[in-house]
Amino acid sequence: MFSELRILRDILLLCFLSVGINAKSSHIEDLDFTDHTNGSPKISRSSYFKQDFRLGYKLKLFCESSGNPRPQIVWYHRGVEVNPDHNRTIRFSIHGDTVSSHLEVDPTSIGDKGEYECVATNLKGSRVKKFLTDYQY
């Protein structure tokens, strides 16, 4: 029991130091306590959490995930799966056990604001990266 408490204390201390040292990790949604040694997806790189866009211009979001087997990425906007259409493009590139995806909305409108999610899934689990978008005039 004491060794489990020490491990938990060390993990919390490491997270605290990481947040204090690296400003990019200061958002709680960027912290990842998942054990990825079993091959479950890991979000390795992504756009920043908060994204502002100008109405009528382009919004670009990026998400990269690795795992074994290689994860599949699905994008959601306000809880609904994003499907490519006249102003939404989704691109993928694959390198070994890593998949990268770009979501592009061009031109943007008021309805494009809100929460987006990049969901990486394989047989061993899922990982979600959230983005919050808002428009400017």
Curated annotation (Swiss-Prot):
CDD domains (alphabetical): Ig
One GO BP annotation of this record: neuron remodeling
Cleavable signal peptide: 1-23
Tissues expressing this chain: Expressed in DD and VD GABAergic motor neurons. Expressed in a subset of head neurons including M2 motor neurons in the pharynx. Expressed in coelomocytes.
Free-text disruption phenotype from the record: Viable with locomotory defects which may be attributed to impaired GABAergic motor neuron function. Hypersensitive to the drug aldicarb which may be indicative of abnormal GABAergic signaling. Premature postsynaptic remodeling/formation of DD GABAergic motor neurons in animals at larval stage L1 with remodeling/formation occurring 8-16 hours posthatching as opposed to 14-18 hours posthatching in wild-type animals.
The Ig-like C2-type domain, residue ranges: 41-133
The protein's name in its UniProt record: Immunoglobulin domain-containing protein oig-1
Pfam families: I-set
Biological function: Plays a role in neural development, where it temporally regulates synapse formation in the D-type inhibitory GABAergic motor neurons, dorsal D (DD) and ventral D (VD) motor neurons. Controls the translocation of postsynaptic proteins, such as the acetylcholine receptor subunit acr-12, and presynaptic proteins, such as snb-1, along nerve cords to prevent premature synapse remodeling/formation.
GO CC terms in record: axon; dendrite; extracellular region; membrane
UniProt main location, coarse: membrane
Cell location: Membrane; Secreted, Extracellular space; Cell projection, Dendrite; Cell projection, Axon
Keywords, ordered alphabetically: Cell projection, Disulfide bond, Immunoglobulin domain, Membrane, Neurogenesis, Secreted, Signal
SUPFAM superfamilies: Immunoglobulin (SSF48726)
SMART domains (UniProt xref): IGc2
Disulfide-linked positions: 63-118
Organism: Caenorhabditis elegans
InterPro entries the record matches: Cell_Adh-Cytoskel_Orgn, Ig-like_dom, Ig-like_dom_sf, Ig-like_fold, Ig_I-set, Ig_sub2
Gene3D superfamilies reported for this sequence: Immunoglobulins
